[in-house]
Curated annotation (Swiss-Prot):
One of its GO terms (biological process) is 1,6-anhydro-N-acetyl-beta-muramic acid catabolic process. Pfam families: AnmK. GO terms for molecular function: ATP binding; kinase activity; phosphotransferase activity, alcohol group as acceptor. Keywords: ATP-binding, Carbohydrate metabolism, Kinase, Nucleotide-binding, Transferase. The lineage of its organism: Bacteria, Bacillati, Cyanobacteriota, Cyanophyceae, Synechococcales. Belongs to the anhydro-N-acetylmuramic acid kinase family. It catalyses: 1,6-anhydro-N-acetyl-beta-muramate + ATP + H2O = N-acetyl-D-muramate 6-phosphate + ADP + H(+). HAMAP family: AnhMurNAc_kinase. It comes from Prochlorococcus marinus (strain MIT 9303). ATP binds at residues 9-16. It comes from the Bacteria. It is an enzyme of class 2 (transferase). Pathway: Amino-sugar metabolism; 1,6-anhydro-N-acetylmuramate degradation; Cell wall biogenesis; peptidoglycan recycling. This is Anhydro-N-acetylmuramic acid kinase.
Length: 379
């Protein structure tokens, strides 16, 4: 089956559309990536999405128009990726505007904004959406949902394999080896903390809105990270939590950035960006090191995808902090760094049609595995 996968992450830079074909066993599918198109959000829409994700109040009309605009850009991305309508099905994550993990006093909740019936009608094809709801209803975090797809798409090697997505948030998948005593272990996955979210916000502030991100890590490359501050930040409560855990821009957004910058008052602009960049690598390295210390997992390699994989300073920080582990870009395995999440949600939509579970209780904390997503058909 040919499926379109649509993904817009916490960086809110636009929609990644992937056209893929799947066949064979759901858990070990044969797949091919047929096309990838990245459609940016208009700047005013991007800013509204970021503001909404940081708790800035919108009125009812603004929420309505935001959901409509997001849906229209998703449709544009889908049509650009699949102009001849080869796909029989669309899997769309929607745009996360708020994510609340389960806490002692209330269940978890997550809101991905999208008008799925409108998207189905615009594309004249069924759309599977709202992928997180079933896991949340079962007491799970609702995130991350990509690890089971990672395991199915990338397969196993002779040792533990890590897959790291550096979007707005850094999320990690660990895939068990194909042989040896750990071969029957469960896939693991969780959110480590901020990846690009704080860096992007800082660069936007510094440039007075002229830059949306640190292109090629050029600002960070001209500075030096403040190691003592990073070590102090790593002791914060979230970074001490064991998996399962999930997070988003509501935790690592503008308010968090401003607090961190107050702790760096005497540093130059370049040193501040370098510190935030090194911090993003450090939160991942600390989680991996904690697993190693507990003799749970020691990955042979770490495959990196997402926008942060294009930042050579961030990638170098990862290599420095994850010694003994091969750190490589997913491009080296034939999977474009920009395609990974769109491909994953295309697979989750295909699994929905096959009634194949898409979550993993060991990863999200849900009571049981469940088929993910809700289907909206054209009118």
């Amino acid at each position: 089956m040919r499926v379109l996968g649509l993904m817009s992450g916490t960086s809110a830079d636009g929609v990644d559309a992937v056209l893929a074909e799947f066949s064979g066993s759901p858990s070990e599918p044969k797949w091919s990536l047929l096309n990838l198109v990245c459609t940016p959000y208009p700047e005013d829409l991007r800013q509204t999405v970021i503001n909404a994700g940081q708790g800035i109040t919108l009125n009812s009309r603004e929420w309505l128009e935001l959901s409509e605009s997001i849906t229209e850009v998703h449709a544009q991305a889908a049509l650009a990726c699949d102009p001849s309508a080869q796909a029989e099905l669309v899997g769309s994550h929607g745009q996360t505007v708020w994510h609340r993990p389960p806490q002692k006093n209330h269940r978890g909740a997550s809101w991905q904004i999208l008008q799925a019936p409108l998207l189905a009608e615009l594309l004249k094809r069924p759309v599977v959406h709202d992928f997180r709801a079933a896991d949340l209803a079962l007491g799970g975090q609702g995130a991350p949902l990509v690890p089971m797809a990672d395991a199915a798409l990338l397969g196993r090697v002779g040792g533990w394999r890590g897959v790291l997505n550096l979007g707005g948030i850094a999320n990690l998948t660990l895939i068990p080896p194909r042989s040896g005593p750990d071969r029957r272990a469960s896939v693991m996955g969780w959110d480590c903390g901020p990846a690009n979210s704080l860096i992007d916000l800082a660069v936007e502030q510094i440039s007075k809105g002229k830059l949306a991100f640190d292109h090629d890590g050029s600002i960070a490359a001209s500075g030096h990270p403040h190691t003592t501050t990073i070590e102090r930040w790593l002791k914060e409560a979230f970074f001490q939590l064991p998996p399962p855990k999930s997070t988003g821009r509501e935790q690592f957004g503008l308010a968090d950035l401003e607090q961190r910058l107050k702790e760096l008052p005497k540093l130059s602009t370049a040193n501040r960006v370098a510190t935030l960049t090194a911090f993003s690598a450090a939160v991942v390295a600390q989680d991996l090191n904690n697993l190693r210390i507990r003799n749970l997992v020691r990955p042979l390699e770490l495959i990196v995808a997402g926008g942060g994989s294009r930042n050579p300073v961030l990638m170098n920080e990862l290599r420095q902090r994850c010694r003994g582990m091969r750190v490589l870009n997913s491009d080296e395995l034939g999977l474009s760094a920009e395609a990974r999440e769109g491909l994953a949600f295309a697979l989750l939509a295909w699994w929905h049609c096959l009634q194949h579970p898409g979550n993993a209780p060991a990863i999200t904390g849900a009571k049981r595995a469940a088929v993910l997503g809700v289907r909206a058909d054209p009118a």
